[in-house]
């Protein structure tokens, strides 16, 4: 199977497993992630709805990408602050860019990390779907950590991080001149630590956000997710 087939396989398996366990149910409030692994999960939910196996859900998307896909598929969407949602969700499902042995995550490859974190941290259960390439022994040295920043603070933040020996890259747009602009009107920087550095995701999630002008960073350490991992041979781990 190619990568897209593996992503569809793990997404469908996760949705079907959660449905069979009663964790996806009529009238539930569900957060829907962003990216190439999360989209098949949205499609599978749409299939359950169109078949009548699932009658109604209250979906909260984490990005414009997900909102548009839900609209195409006929899934009604809400915000976390909608009266029907009330600020909390039953479950959220999303992909990840890196997963360490403690199930800490790096997310934000799709530049939607701020809303992804708001949704994940306000859900009773958080489910992550990914392929085996996303499992790592340590974080912040392979896949660069995305950080959402206020544009005006770009240079001051860059200098503060570089003073700690951290490499900083302003993410450039594709089919758009200049930097990536998030759904919230901010910039994304991607940062990497030296290979010899001791990267502590839990501590860094807190300390990075204390830098003036940082909106949010892509470490997700505060709620341990249930993780579905698909391997190249098609087998799926439920961690």
Curated annotation (Swiss-Prot):
Pathway noted in the entry: Carbohydrate degradation; pentose phosphate pathway; D-ribose 5-phosphate from D-ribulose 5-phosphate (non-oxidative stage): step 1/1
Assigned EC number: 5.3.1.6
Biological process according to GO: D-ribose metabolic process; pentose-phosphate shunt, non-oxidative branch
Catalysis: reaction(s): aldehydo-D-ribose 5-phosphate = D-ribulose 5-phosphate
InterPro entries given in the database record: NagB/RpiA_transferase-like, Ribose5P_isomerase_typA_subgr, Ribose5P_isomerase_type_A
Keyword Membrane (UniProt): no
Domain of life: Bacteria
Residue positions of the active site: 116 (proton acceptor)
GO molecular function: ribose-5-phosphate isomerase activity
Cellular component GO terms held in the UniProt record: cytosol
Residues involved in substrate binding: 34-37, 94-97, 107-110, 134
Keywords of this entry: Isomerase
Keyword NAD assigned: no
Subunit text: Homodimer.
Family of this protein: Belongs to the ribose 5-phosphate isomerase family.
Function: Catalyzes the reversible conversion of ribose-5-phosphate to ribulose 5-phosphate.
Protein name: Ribose-5-phosphate isomerase A
Record organism: Treponema denticola (strain ATCC 35405 / DSM 14222 / CIP 103919 / JCM 8153 / KCTC 15104)
Encoding gene (name): rpiA
């Amino acid at each position: 199977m190619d990568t897209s087939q593996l992503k569809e396989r793990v997404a469908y398996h996760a949705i079907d497993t959660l449905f069979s366990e009663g964790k996806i149910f009529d009238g539930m409030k569900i957060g829907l992630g962003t990216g190439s692994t999360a989209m098949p999960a949205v499609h599978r939910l749409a299939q359950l709805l169109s078949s009548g196996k699932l009658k109604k859900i209250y979906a909260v998307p984490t990005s414009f990408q997900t909102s548009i896909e839900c609209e195409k598929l006929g899934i009604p969407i809400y915000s976390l602050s909608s009266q029907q949602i009330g600020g909390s969700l039953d479950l959220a499902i999303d992909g990840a860019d890196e997963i360490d042995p403690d199930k800490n995550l790096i997310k934000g490859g799709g530049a939607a990390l701020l809303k992804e974190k708001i949704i994940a941290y306000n859900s009773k259960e958080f489910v992550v779907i990914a392929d085996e390439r996303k499992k790592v022994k340590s974080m912040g040295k392979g896949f660069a950590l995305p950080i959402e920043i206020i544009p005006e603070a770009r240079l001051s933040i860059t200098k503060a991080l570089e003073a700690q020996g951290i490499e900083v890259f302003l993410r450039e747009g594709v089919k758009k001149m200049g930097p990536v602009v998030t759904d919230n009107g901010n910039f994304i920087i991607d940062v990497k630590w030296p290979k010899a550095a001791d990267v502590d995701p839990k501590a860094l999630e807190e300390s990075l956000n204390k830098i003036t002008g940082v909106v949010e960073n892509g470490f997700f350490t505060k709620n341990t997710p249930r993780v579905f991992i698909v391997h190249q041979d098609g087998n799926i781990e439920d961690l």
